[in-house]
Amino acid sequence: MRNRMLENVILKNLQRVETGLREKSLMCAVEIEMDRPDLTTAEFEDAIRYLEDKGLVNRFTNLIGETVWGITEMGRDALKGL
């Protein structure tokens, strides 16, 4: 089941940074903002994969091999409509 609030919080956190966020840092920021320390990795991954499929976020690997997430221009435009 989609969690639109979780998706919006992910987009808002990614919009605040220029270079993207490591996956664990993003998940921690989302947990804090939503006040949900019980957020599961599966819930988070479902939401971020949905956003990636829609072209709102992109995933890349930094030089030390960590997964980093960033927001696309389409993602920024989607946030303007909220």
Labelled PLM ranges:
Residues 64-71:
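Minor-groove-contacting beta-hairpin "wing" of winged helix-turn-helix DNA-binding domains
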Residues 20-32:
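Short acidic, hydrophobic short linear motifs in intrinsically disordered regions
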Residues 52-62:
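A short, conserved structural fragment
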Residues 73-82:
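Short, amphipathic alpha-helical interaction segments positioned at domain boundaries
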Residues 2, 37-53:
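Short amphipathic alpha-helical interaction segments
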Residues 1-20:
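Short alpha-helical segments that sit at the start of domains
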Residues 17-18, 35-39:
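Short acidic, glycine/proline-enriched loop segments that cap or flank alpha-helices
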